[in-house]
């Protein structure tokens, strides 16, 4: 049994001269039903609500302001779900809508609840359809792309494979639309390779919010958690059938043999730091090389305001980020200590090692 996450991009659901949006979804769902029938589990992360909403409203150009985008998403999301429901009903499967925002992942409790809900739906042989909650999320709560969301969901449910269906056939060394010497990249084996790949392609067309960079970010998140990622051209729907049967996508991002684990992935990728802790060389060495927690005495400066148990990033004297974690002490209390520099034989822990992830752990 394989647990699949399939991300379907906006550009694939707009329809074209050959296939309507309805036909495209029906085709994908047919392949998914085949996979489920042989015992696999599948979830879909589907874009398209804004694009379909614009289409139904007769808008020829995608709006730029957030309120218009949210209104279009509200129109399109219901229609999008009706297409999936109709397509899967033919094969005897129910579908479930799950709308998420960044805040759902920033709370450890909500993060766990979301994963448990998805797993229960899978136990019931339901097909979860996940999308960002575009209709209510403000700029601070939005991921802005479903590539990152698909990787975080895959991590939360411990998926085996993530398929990113898009409108390119594979990853290239540069944008082949503008560079005739662009070389195809069929395999990527580490996060370092992902970081080193320089893509000069346009970030998106005007109907989508994801681009090559967001797909690289998604691949980095997923592979660090032991998940194989396929980047494939969804304009040829049959490629999904082939991948679900064991073939490969145009580019395969191979999983890290030593996953960092759900907790560290949550700390590194799901949380938005509310402040920055500047540490001295002693604290840097203790954190980086000795596996220690961050004590308050090692903090020399602080940026931002945050409450107890909120996420922070930790930087060295050069301002380079070295870690992220959860602060057990508020910014107000830390500033009070810095201003007074109270001497003690036992200083409190600000970020415990159990809720800290090193930046270097993400570069392997």
UniProtKB/Swiss-Prot annotation:
Keyword presence, tRNA-binding: no
Entry binding sites for ATP: 7, 166-167, 209-215
Molecular-function annotations in GO: ATP binding; glutamate 5-kinase activity; RNA binding
Cellular localisation: Cytoplasm
Positions of the PUA domain: 274-349
Binding site for substrate: 47, 134, 146
One Gene Ontology CC term in the entry: cytosol
Record-linked SUPFAM superfamilies: Carbamate kinase-like, PUA domain-like
InterPro entries noted in UniProt: AceGlu_kinase-like_sf, Asp/Glu/Uridylate_kinase, G5K_ProB, Glu/AcGlu_kinase, Glu_5kinase, Glu_5kinase/COase_Synthase, Glutamate_5-kinase_CS, PUA
Disulfide-bonded cysteines: none
Entry keyword annotation includes Membrane: no
Family note: Belongs to the glutamate 5-kinase family.
Function recorded in the entry: Catalyzes the transfer of a phosphate group to glutamate to form L-glutamate 5-phosphate.
Protein name: Glutamate 5-kinase
Organism encoding this protein: Prochlorococcus marinus (strain SARG / CCMP1375 / SS120)
């Amino acid at each position: 049994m394989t647990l699949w996450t399939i991300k379907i991009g906006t550009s694939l659901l707009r329809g074209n001269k050959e296939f309507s949006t309805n036909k495209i979804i029906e085709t994908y769902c047919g392949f998914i039903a085949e996979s489920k029938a042989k015992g696999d589990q599948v979830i879909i992360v589907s874009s398209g609500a804004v694009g379909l909403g614009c289409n139904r409203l007769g808008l020829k150009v995608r709006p730029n302001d957030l309120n218009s985008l949210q209104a279009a998403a509200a129109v399109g999301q219901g229609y999008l779900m009706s297409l999936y429901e109709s397509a899967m009903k033919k094969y005897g499967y129910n579908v479930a809508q799950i709308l998420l925002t960044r805040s759902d992942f920033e709370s450890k409790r909500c993060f766990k609840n979301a994963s448990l809900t998805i797993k229960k739906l899978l136990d019931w042989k339901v097909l979860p359809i996940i999308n960002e909650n575009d209709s209510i999320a403000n700029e601070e709560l939005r991921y802005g792309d479903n590539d990152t969301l698909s990787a975080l969901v895959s991590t939360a449910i411990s998926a085996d494979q993530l398929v990113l269906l898009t409108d390119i056939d594979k990853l290239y060394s540069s944008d082949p639309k503008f560079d005739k010497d662009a070389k195809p990249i069929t395999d990527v084996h580490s996060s370092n390779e992902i970081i080193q790949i320089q893509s000069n392609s346009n970030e998106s067309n005007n109907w989508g919010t994801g681009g090559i960079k967001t797909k690289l970010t998604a691949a980095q998140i997923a592979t660090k958690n032991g998940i194989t990622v396929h980047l494939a051209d969804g304009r040829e729907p049959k490629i999904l059938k082939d991948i679900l049967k064991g073939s490969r996508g145009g580019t395969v991002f191979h999983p890290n043999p030593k996953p960092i684990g759900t907790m560290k992935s949550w700390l590194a990728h799901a949380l938005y730091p509310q402040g920055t802790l500047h540490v001295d060389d002693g604290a840097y060495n203790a954190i980086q090389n000795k596996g220690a927690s961050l004590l308050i005495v090692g903090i020399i400066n602080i940026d931002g305001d945050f409450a107890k148990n909120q996420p922070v990033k930790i930087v060295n004297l050069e301002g380079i980020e070295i870690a992220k974690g959860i602060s057990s002490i508020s910014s107000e209390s830390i500033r009070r200590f810095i201003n007074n520099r109270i001497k003690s034989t036992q200083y409190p822990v600000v970020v415990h090692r159990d809720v800290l992830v090193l930046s270097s752990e993400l570069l392997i």
